[in-house]
């Protein structure tokens, strides 16, 4: 069954394994999450657990948010996300989910929001090749032909535009270390997002098969 936690990307560092191998890791701070709601098929049409992360100031919370938090006997949260495919009997409204949910060696999927790069051209945005630089060439970084038949730009054509700020999931990363007293997970490799951005860590369904 799926297990997961919400956290914050702190940055990257490197640690040594017991065998003396240097491993680059991403540090994720995941203070205890609060179970805000347990959704069932009878009441909601599907099964899920709703987790809340990071307290939100009362003055910034509206009445529905405060009422939702009161049911879980907690304060309003900045980030609320749902986990599906979980064992509902393991969760109770108002209980906490900590980093000890995971252990070293677990394989996880990490979801975050990619860093924004503003308005970019085809070469940076879609990794296309440059045009010739010499011999009278008049195209170097332009998108190129839009097509010669249909007198319009076909849907899905790779063109310049806004790059980044998309939801990205990297699968099958390994939990290298769990520091329970500091609410920290160290995950091998890099994860999407800028520093201090919200991260969702879930157990990998593919790895368990």
Swiss-Prot record:
Listed InterPro entries: Ribosomal_uL3, Ribosomal_uL3_bac/org-type, Ribosomal_uL3_CS, Transl_B-barrel_sf
GO molecular function per UniProt: rRNA binding; structural constituent of ribosome
Domain of life: Bacteria
Entry's Gene Ontology BP terms: translation
UniProt entry keywords in alphabetical sequence: Ribonucleoprotein, Ribosomal protein, RNA-binding, rRNA-binding
GO cellular component terms given for this protein: cytosolic large ribosomal subunit
Oligomeric and partner information: Part of the 50S ribosomal subunit. Forms a cluster with proteins L14 and L19.
Protein name, UniProt field: Large ribosomal subunit protein uL3
Encoding gene, per UniProt annotation: rplC
